[in-house]
Amino acid sequence: MHEDRPWLRFYGKVPTSLEYPAVTLYEALAATARRVPQAVAWDFFGTRSTYAQLLADVDRCAAALAAEGLREGGRLLISMPTSPQGVIAFYAANRLGALPALIHPLSTAPEITHFLDVTGARMALTLDAFYGPLAAATPKQPLARIVIARIPEYLSPFKRFGFWATKGRRIPPVPADPRVRSWSAILAAVRGEAARRREDR
């Protein structure tokens, strides 16, 4: 019975497998948001989001990424620390049927080049602090879009100032690059388009 998996004989009464619903990660998130909408989904240095808000943010991000060219079967390279933007973009890509490819945010340009060649990603999300190595990568298929996020986007005003005073002001500005869009700008564009559609009704 356990010849191919001999470790199972040590499980005792513990189930050797569980029943998992045949749903996508996005669908699992949506189910959680329906079940416990006001539960805390994430806490980022004191800034919190409920599951209901996270789902709304994921839906908006999916629309924004689609507007920037991410399609079903596409790849989104995510080079982020553990921050809200990375979590939101991960589920947004899944909602679109795209594949999020997470890499270490401190990866070097040669490493990023390898990851881009392996995944075939044409779009990437990273922090302003990590733009340099990403821009210096030389994959066979160059990135078509780079979305730049910033840590203060999800901090309270007080902590936003503290971040700028201690670390943020030392981050070099992202140079002019036609491939670059800011995280806040692509989300704002989706909100603006939604507002225009409501006005046209």
Task: Locate the predicted segments by residue.
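A local structural micro-motif
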Residues: 41, 73-74, 101, 124
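A generic local structural motif
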Residues: 27-29, 62-65, 110-113, 131-136, ...
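Short, charged, surface-exposed hinge/linker loops at domain edges
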Residues: 2-19
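Flexible, low-complexity linker/hinge segments
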Residues: 14-23, 163-201
